[in-house]
Amino acid sequence: MKERQQLICIFDCESILDTELIRRVWNLEGEDFEVSKEAMKKQFEESASEFLPLPFHKVISICAVITDHFGKFIKVNKIEGESEAEMISNFFKFIDKFSPKLVSFNGKNYDMPLLVLRALKYNIKASTYLDTISDKWNNYKSRFNELKHCDLFESLGAGRGMRLDTICAMANLPGKYDVHGDQVLELFYQNELEKIHEYCESDVLNTFMLYLKYEFIKGNLTEEDYANSLSLMSEYLQEHKANRGYVDIFVHCSDEEIKRILEK
């Protein structure tokens, strides 16, 4: 039987505050949006940051780019689910079924710890991701190891101010084109969940392009490999995501990057 090649899953999560937990722990009252803003205000007064500890967050979107083991683009989409629990369950089931290589930007510090915390809330099994016994030195939880989970934030230095948008701007990649992370809370309470999914998809496309560039400068991709992967992404976006506002930006950026690579 032919051995199945490992997929690569470049992923990102978006979250808002868990107002139910905030009410229970902090005794705040009011509508969800007001409770969220008040909690952020209190957190800022205590720590000079509005970002609450991870247990106070809940997941509202998970999106992923899927490629083959060589980085050739297959698709980008949101992880389906009628509820937070179903969405997270589907994500961990995907990991259980395919054991993909994960790629993220700060996913070892934010996305995956958050998903595991919410799995605890809903009693969702994450056995493959949490398995540190079968291979002690090569598992999803290994630090400073890119074989099972390449966290580009970690790989590129993990320094203060290392933001995906800034790195993309420096590296001639699209970056954030419309929505920024601090707008997600307001968009959610304006019933703009699809806009959040679109933003999350654009983030994973940026991460995918940054990952390709990283693999290229490491010597793992030739110029032709790199250009081909970008071309496949552009073709997919134009055929399957024509209604997304980010398509023209990513296609143009991809075309320009291909020119730079092949004209060297």
List PLM regions with ranges.
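DEDD superfamily 3′-5′ metal-dependent exonuclease/proofreading module
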Residues: 1-264
